[in-house]
Every structure is written in C-alpha cells, then in structure tokens.
Amino acid sequence: MAKLANPRDVIIAPVVSEKSYGLMEQNVYTFYVSTDSNKTQIKDAVEQIFGVKVASVNTVNRAGKRKRTRTGYGQRKSTKRAYVTLREGSDSIDVFGAGA
C-alpha cells in the first residue's frame, strides 16, 4: 500500500448534489478522491484533515459520460467518489465552510 505524502492529494473536493446533502444528515459525507487511492488512504486523509473518526468508507468508480460536439465525440473525465461514514458521537464535518 503506497502512502501519499499529503492527505490533500487524496481528497480532491466534496461532492455537491442533492444526494450528498441528504446523506449528511446520516453522518455520511461524499468526496471526489484520487483515482489511485484506496479506502485506507481515504480514511486516514479524512481523519487528518477534518479531525474526526471514520467508521467506514465505500468507493464508487464512475466512468465519464460520452458527449457529442460539433466535430465528433469526446468524453468527460472519469471520477472516483468516496462515501465516508463517521462513527457515532463523532463531530460533523463542515465541508462547505469558509475556514477550509
């Protein structure tokens, strides 16, 4: 298992969607993560950056959509998402706060 030097190389950005907002009420937070990171690296990065305890991490690889342009076809970038569940009694994460 390769360790990345900086935990901010693992966590790219929070996912902004209706589903991710709904999951926040259940202590599940969604992040775009590096495609070559694993669940252990994601867990360590979230615990270091936000100072919380992680119960579990689920990941999803999403293929980029094929899009048509005037000159032919292209493809959006493929992404990896991580659904991070916090432990019971753990503080919530302010992912959209100004202090980040």
Swiss-Prot record:
Checking Pfam families in the record gives:
Ribosomal_L23
Q: Does the keyword Secreted apply?
A: no
Q: Which UniProt keywords apply?
A: Ribonucleoprotein, Ribosomal protein, RNA-binding, rRNA-binding
Q: Which domain of life is it from?
A: Bacteria
- Which HAMAP family does the record match to this protein? Ribosomal_uL23_B
State whether it acts alone or in a complex, and with which partners, per the record: Part of the 50S ribosomal subunit. Contacts protein L29, and trigger factor when it is bound to the ribosome.
- Protein name, as recorded: Large ribosomal subunit protein uL23
